[in-house]
């Protein structure tokens, strides 16, 4: 799972504050309060 913003974006994800919006799910971490969100489709 991604552990920072660069890794998250490389995996075509984005950093969401505390949660992710559908259809994205938490799939890692960007920083303390930001989670890496990835599309489930």
UniProtKB/Swiss-Prot annotation:
Q: What InterPro entries does this protein's entry cite?
A: Defensin_beta-like
The UniProt function text for this chain reads: Has antibacterial activity against the Gram-positive bacterium S.aureus 1056 MRSA (MIC=1.25 ug/ml) and the Gram-negative bacterium E.coli O157:H7 (MIC=0.96 ug/ml). Has antifungal activity against the yeast C.albicans 3153A (MIC=6.20 ug/ml).
Q: What protein is this chain from?
A: Ostricacin-2
Q: Alphabetically list the UniProt keywords.
A: Antibiotic, Antimicrobial, Defensin, Disulfide bond, Fungicide, Secreted
Which is a Gene Ontology cellular component entry for this protein?
extracellular region
* UniProt main location, coarse: secreted
Q: What GO biological process term is on the record, naming one?
A: defense response to bacterium
Q: Which cysteines are joined by disulfide bonds?
A: 8-36, 15-30, 20-37
Q: Which family does it belong to?
A: Belongs to the beta-defensin family.
Q: Does the keyword Lipoprotein apply?
A: no
What Pfam families does the annotation carry?
Answer: Defensin_beta
Q: Does the keyword Disulfide bond apply?
A: yes
Annotated localization: Secreted
**Which species is this record about?**
Struthio camelus
């Amino acid at each position: 799972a991604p552990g920072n913003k660069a890794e998250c974006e490389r995996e075509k994800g984005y950093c969401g504050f505390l949660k992710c919006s559908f259809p994205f799910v938490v799939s890692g971490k960007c920083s303390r309060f930001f989670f890496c969100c990835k599309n489930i489709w």
